[in-house]
């Protein structure tokens, strides 16, 4: 990094390459969005790009979309994202803008994508953040260095051990249920098991995701330091993880899509056979983390865009098979909360739930595309991440890690 001051200066310079678009007068909609609303959305994007004096991205992009819907019949987040991703590309004929494209030329430029949505809000919102993917990788490298001191501390290792203990405790509870029921009583056992299940699921599903340093190493960063453990080795470790869904290579030949979908279904069955004792039923809300490495023989014309991978191949099987929900509020028993703690129940308001039709889904999905490796197969690896700590996606985590590191550096500099 040469120096901490230099690293911070370069980070601030990269931040100026980012584009932020915020629209609060258009309801997020799927492809059924009226033509006039589509024009209105593109006009808003064009206006903000003009104000920012920004042109169309021509290279690889990291993209983040946050949505808020108000409609009682709001579509699922991935169908909204599909519509918006298309609208961020080719300019519609009625929209005034000097270029043929708006934010980017083709959504296959997107190498990292994050989509989140909250339904049942008071006001609609569409928030879009974009930056050159190369700048994102530089941020990732800085964040990985910032995380190193945290993840090498004794407190961090103690926290990891404590999290793992919840899983062991839950396994012990179900293996020795008769003894525990005798000592705790039926109601006492049920209440304790439910509490431990929540913490155990949270621990297991948190650990299934890749950390910032590992993500950094999988991209071959830092480039100028030999670690003795190449990026393909880190990818192999992720591919071998039993707490992730390993669904093989993306289809790149005619007729192979159905085979890939069957592979996804088979892997879900195998995963549930290993973990249903812990995750069925799911009592925590989850997000999806998808790591994709294409086969080096993939023709450019058939390279799958990241949203297509999640929308067409993963969500249709994962959501119904695991019973995932789009909002953590669906995991709360408000009747039980009213009985046990009426004050907290009251603080949620008279009608705390999102519209019923929006229940199925995930709280967020993010996908990262690794570069192909000559002589190595492609793969798709998926983690169901516990989304209960308000930590956000990896893009948020990168900025938060750098912010914490910079704050610590400031204190050291002053004192």
Positions of predicted regions on the chain:
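Acidic, proline/glycine-enriched N-terminal capping motif
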Residues: 1-415
């Amino acid at each position: 990094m040469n120096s901490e001051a230099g690293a911070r200066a370069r980070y601030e310079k990269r931040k100026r390459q980012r584009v932020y678009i915020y629209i609060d007068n258009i309801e997020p909609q799927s492809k059924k969005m009226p033509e006039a609303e589509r024009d209105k959305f593109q006009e808003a994007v064009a206006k903000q790009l003009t104000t920012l004096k920004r042109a169309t991205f021509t290279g690889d992009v990291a993209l983040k979309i946050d949505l808020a819907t108000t409609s009682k019949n709001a579509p699922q987040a991935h169908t909204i994202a599909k519509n918006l991703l298309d609208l961020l590309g080719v300019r519609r004929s009625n929209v005034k803008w000097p270029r043929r494209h708006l934010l980017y030329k083709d959504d296959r430029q997107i190498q990292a994508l994050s989509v989140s949505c909250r339904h049942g809000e008071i006001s609609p919102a569409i928030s879009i953040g974009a930056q050159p993917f190369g700048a994102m990788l530089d941020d990732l490298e800085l964040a990985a260095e910032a995380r190193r001191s945290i993840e090498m501390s004794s407190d961090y290792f103690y926290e990891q051990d404590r999290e793992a203990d919840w899983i062991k405790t839950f396994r012990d509870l179900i293996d020795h249920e008769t003894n525990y029921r005798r000592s705790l009583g039926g109601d006492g056992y049920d209440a304790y098991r439910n509490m431990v299940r929540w913490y155990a699921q949270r621990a297991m599903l948190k650990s299934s995701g890749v950390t910032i340093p590992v993500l950094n190493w999988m991209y071959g960063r830092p480039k100028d330091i030999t670690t003795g453990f190449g990026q393909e080795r880190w990818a192999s470790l992720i591919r071998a993880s039993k707490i992730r869904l390993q669904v093989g290579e993306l289809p790149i030949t005619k007729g192979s899509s159905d085979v890939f979908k069957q592979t996804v279904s088979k892997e879900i069955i195998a995963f549930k056979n290993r973990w249903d004792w812990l995750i069925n039923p799911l009592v925590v809300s989850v997000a999806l983390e998808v790591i994709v490495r294409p086969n080096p023989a993939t023709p450019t014309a058939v390279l799958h865009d990241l949203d297509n991978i999640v929308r067409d191949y993963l969500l249709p099987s994962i959501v119904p098979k695991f019973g995932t929900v789009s909002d953590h509020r669906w995991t709360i028993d408000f009747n039980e909360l009213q009985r046990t703690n009426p004050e907290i129940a009251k603080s949620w308001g008279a009608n705390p739930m999102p519209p019923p039709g929006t229940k199925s889904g995930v709280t967020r999905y993010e996908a990262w595309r690794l570069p192909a490796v000559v002589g190595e197969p492609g793969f798709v690896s998926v983690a169901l991440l516990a989304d209960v700590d308000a930590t956000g996606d990896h893009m948020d985590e990168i900025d938060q890690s750098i912010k914490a590191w910079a704050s610590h550096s400031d204190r050291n500099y002053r004192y």
